[in-house]
Amino acid sequence: AIESRGFVFASAVSYILKKPFIMLRKKNKLPADVHSIDFELEYGTATIEVHKDSLDENDNVLIIDDLIATGGTAEAATKLVEISKSKVTAFIFVINLFDLGGSDNLVKNNYKVENLIDFPGH
C-alpha cells in the first residue's frame, strides 16, 4: 500500500486475503534499512521507501492506493518492488483521474489495473 490513504483500503484487502500488508512510506518514516526511490510529481519531487526485508525474491505484489492521477507514484512503487526482486502483478485504485493518463500508462506497460471509480481530473 502507498502512504497514506492507500493503507486504509489495503489493510482490509490484506486481512480478507490473509496476505501480508506492506507499507510504502514517505522518506524517513520507516525504522529499519530501506530501499528508496525519488520520483516526480505534478507539483515537485518526492521519495518513497520500503523496508528491505518486507519483500522476498519472486513475491507477487498487488499495489493498492486511493487515487491515480499521472501515475508517478505508482511507477515509483513498481520500481521499489522490482528493486526487491519481486513482481507487481496488479494495481487497484479507488479513484482514477482518467484524463491525466496514469492508469492508461500502467495498462500500456502490461500491468493489470482495476479502478473502482473513474472521474475527470480537470
Model-derived regions: residue spans:
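Short glycine-rich phosphate-binding loop at a beta-alpha junction
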Residues: 1-3
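Short, catalytically relevant binding-site loops at active-site mouths
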Residues: 5-8, 28-30
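Short Gly/Thr/Asp-enriched flexible loops that form oxyanion-binding sites at enzyme active sites
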Residues: 8-17, 78
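Short, well-ordered secondary-structure micro-motifs
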Residues: 11-12, 33-35, 101-104
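A short helix-loop-beta submotif of the ANL/AMP-binding
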Residues: 17-20, 86
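Short, glycine/charge-rich flexible loops or terminal/linker lids adjacent to PRPP-binding catalytic cores
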Residues: 19-61
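Conserved G/P- and acidic residue-centered "switch" motifs that form tight phosphate/ATP-binding loops
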Residues: 66, 71
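PRPP-dependent phosphoribosyltransferase catalytic core
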Residues: 75-122
